[in-house]
Amino acid sequence: MSIKPLPAILFATATALALTACGSASTPSAPTASAKASSAAAADPSTAPLRGIVIASTEYNSDNTTDTITAYDPTTGEVTATRTFTVPSEYTTYTGGACEREHCYSPDFERVLAIDTSGGNERVAVASSDGSFTLLNDLIPVPQGSRSYSNAYAKFGPDGSIYVAHEDKPDDGDFVGTLYRFASETEAPEAVPTTFTVSNTQDFQILPDSTPIAIGYYAWAANNSGIGCYGALAVTSDGTCLTVDKDAVYSKKGKPLSQTTESDKSLRIEEWTKVNLPNLEGTHEIVKTLRLSPDGTRMALLAPFKKLEDDMSFQLYSAPVGGGEATQLTKATDIAGSKHIILAWSE
């Protein structure tokens, strides 16, 4: 076996590397069209995925109502994605009546329910991020000899279906209530059986398994194990319910829905424990909206200053679920409008 001297080996290696480098430099690879399109799409907030801390705000104008959904980076507070919905002025979103809080929005946040309560028979419509606006009333069947009386409540279900509580008034009889499910806003609905009487005075909620239940003023919230509380805004994996009341966050141990009583359906804040957030107490108004981080250790809060002259915008904070110093996401400076809700904190 012959052994080459070290200088010869180094010279050969250097020559090979130089040739390789020249060959590589002579044929540079240009970005493909798909790569450019992907990069442009990622930079466009109107089409980027709604991930991070997702907040909806509603602005009522003289000629329309505008809903804006904005996703913020949970580390920096920078805007990563947006969606805008504009509906006629006679319609409202996030009404607190026919449609309440997060149930006004589809699970993917690409659609929002809009309700017109100006007439005797409420009109229910769906506004989409693609600009479409679809009225659902015309798809609801009205029995012969009856008239459509009320579409009192409307909600999105966990699978994106739309549920509408509808009442008919026969010419010679009492009101008849039916809960309708729309698989989409372009398909005729199907009637859904319920264990409660559907009426324009009975609110309802759709559980994660798509079961409808009657509710009063407070909705049921639970974790993935089914442990929760009425009136909770979020529930941790260990079954701790969290809510906001009187400018403070409160916690309480939850229970399965099957073990709740009528008294549990009311929010008795004296039965809850205040969560200590020292740098917000006394100076900030904590808005009644809250979402947990994907790992369940922190909560996202909206907390504007109590004195409007201090700051007209809403500050976005995250804080440990058990209490402690709240951290402001200082770059989230454009949160404005008259109604706000944190829809999600997702990865």
State where each predicted segment sits.
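C-terminal motif of bacterial Sec signal peptides marking the signal peptidase cleavage site
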Residues: 18-21
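Bacterial signal peptide processing site
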Residues: 23-25
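An edge-strand/N-cap motif at the start of beta-rich repeat modules
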Residues: 32-81
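Short glycine/acidic-enriched loop and turn motifs that connect beta-strands
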Residues: 59-64, 117-121, 167-174, 217-223, ...
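Short loop/turn segments that connect beta-strands within beta-propeller blades
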Residues: 74-77, 127-131, 182-187, 236, ...
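Beta-propeller fold detector
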Residues: 78-87, 133-141, 189-196, 237-245, ...
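Repeated scaffold domains used in trafficking and secretory/extracellular systems
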Residues: 88-105, 144-155, 197-207, 233, ...
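Hydrophobic beta-strand positions that form the internal "hydrophobic ladder"
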Residues: 112, 162-163, 212-213, 241, ...
